[in-house]
Amino acid sequence: MISIVVFSLLSVLSVGMFTWKMRSIIAQIRLGKKTQRLDQPSLRFKTMLLVAFGQKKMFNRPISALLHFVFYVAFIITQIELIEVFIDGFSGSHRIFYHTDFQQVYVFIISTIEVLSLLTFVATLAFFSRRNIVKLPRFNMKELLGWPRKDANLILLFELLLIIFIFTMNGADEASKLLQSNVGYGFAMSQYLGPLFFGRINNPEILEVLSKIGWWGHLLMVFVFLNYLPYSKHLHILFAFPNTYFSNLDKKGKFSNMDAVTQEVKLMLDPTLVPAEMTSDTIASFGAKDVNDLSWKNLLDAYSCTECGRCTSVCPANITGKALSPRKIMMDTRDRLQEVGKNNLNCKDGKSLLGDYITEEELWACTSCNACVQECPVNIDPLSIIVDLRRFLVMEESKVPSELTGMLTNIENNGAPWQFSPADRLKWTEEN
């Protein structure tokens, strides 16, 4: 009875804390400006199935894709066992599904989970070595120093502990059943690991304690992971699906029109026009200076970022030694958004995304090639943020690199980037 009460309290507390934090994150995302992402629902659903559920873009790099796929499948299938854990926790039973007419199906499912857990254990060690021993370049860039690196390693540690607790529970149960009836459960891995690690224990009470340690350890790791998730880059586990559904379906390279500019043009063409949303107190702004100037999809992108670095690894500006890192753009956006969240969603703290987090040098290093957008496994669009920040620099602060000043002047005067009169534009065709 005590265990049921403790389990119930922990469950309510854990879910309550997680819900409270997620409400805060959603409130932060809703600070963004409106953007239309509800058109073409069938195509959006197809994109979500292929990119998020099917992991389509992950397989551009087969080795890491296979390792991640093991994690992904194990995470989904293991939830079946978690259902049993919760039923046992609320009812005070133990392996309730084993004692039913579906015993063989139950053994098959647990065996599948064990095989996947073992593969995940190997994949976890591989991921750890890639980050800390092999030290792949994209995992050792300056934006990952400090907390981001600790975050990645901490989640790998959680995964290892979770797997150890699962096999402790199953192995002790297997050894206990063999001791008492000479016939075990027959789980794929525990039928070997149980006797190997616990076979010398001849006291069923000790085996029961070990099983409970594994059960409670498994449960606590789930609760810890659940409430750690909103503070970690692994929030993409939840946000990858809506983020891919709300992907930009326009062709890459197509820039969005600015509503403020469109309104200004309409007013220039028809001075008598007064748009319904504009009042005499409304001051049009161009581009984005802070997170509240970006769209809600930009902010969802920031929280969906996995910090995998695929975007940065293909960025031509970064490859040639420039300051730009698309991954850092997304990380900075999320960091600023979290700071605004701590200020009760108030952006008026004397700071801004542009300047305090992202520098002008980073923005102007971007070639707008869309390589980062193409490479992202969850369809994040760093270029959209970069363009909006550059628009603010140009249209609000008149800050333009000298390399672009001549081009913009020519476009204004001649309607083309070149310093030729429009009347002379076709003279080259007359040359021999």
Feature map (PLM): residue ranges:
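Membrane-embedded alpha-helical bundles of multi-pass integral membrane proteins
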Residues: M1-V274
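Peripheral terminal and linker regions in Fe-S/redox and tRNA-modifying enzymes
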Residues: V6, M22, P62-Y72, I76, ...
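Short acidic (Asp/Glu) and glycine-rich catalytic loops that position anionic groups and cofactors
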Residues: I26-I29, L219-M221, C308-S313, C366-N370, ...
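Flexible gly/pro/ser-rich segments immediately N-terminal to CXXCH heme-c attachment motifs
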Residues: T112, G146-W147, I206-W216, L294-T306, ...
